[in-house]
Amino acid sequence: MPFRTPNSELRMKMFIPRLFIALCYRAVYKLHHALCLRPGAPLEHSKLIVVGSFRTGGAGKTPFCIWLCKHLAAQGNTVALLAHEYAFDEIKMLRQKFAGNESVQVFATRNRYRLAHELDRSQKFDCIVCDDGFEDSRLVGATTILLQWEDLPTKIPELWPCGGMRSLAKDHHLDHGKRSPMVRILRCEGGNPAVRFVIDKVLHFYSGKEFVKNSAKVNIVCGLGNPERFCSDLQDFGIEIGHKFFFKDHSKAFTAQFEKIIQNRPQETFVISEKDAARLPAEFIQKNEKSQIFVASQTTEISTEVAQNLF
């Protein structure tokens, strides 16, 4: 028999129940799509664009949607950007980003398919962009932009909670050469990626002054889908990290917990993301105006060639 260490036995004990949950998740996923997400009717007027990823979170869909909507608007298009209302923090950030931009409107919805058809019938928008509608198989006729960080998932152990994937390649006709010509797969890592997400500035939340690199270590307070990638991007920017405080994506406890952290570390410096900054209420902002809080802004870099061949 092969030798097993205590750690390997522990990992196996943890893996088996997770695999069982992944199998149950897979069954529910297939049933939900068969009963509730049957392919619907295509739009008649607007161009439908879906931005998605296999990852459960942290793939960069929202930053990419910001770039995409600006790109489409710069070409003279009117754009509707649809986001799930559950992601309240992302919606706040998106509305801040596009405040004053008459070419782009942000909509919060529980049903992208229904709202897309309502907007299509209004004939007010040239393009309708869905932030994370990859799993909604009702959205027929869409151009899908898939942000890919790993190889396409093909096995059950890659699904949540064993892995970080929501579905398999075969669920979207992406395996074994069945890829639709209406799917654009953009790699986000590795050599010469099609898309890069880069932190280009870190500014004081209140004064707007730039963060001075090579100063004291900072604490990261983060409620993103992939907080470790956020930390890695900050290190690439030149920031030395002290403590890390991570919260679930879209956590409604973020503000209260962040305030406790500041109270316990009043003289220390903190860096948060734009999305986390957008969710902070006015009371928090007024109360902590003397705190050393910096906001990291991220830019999406896409080559001219890739941008020209998206559609």
Language-model features and meaning:
Residues 2, 7, 153-269:
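C-terminal accessory "lid"/substrate-recognition subdomains
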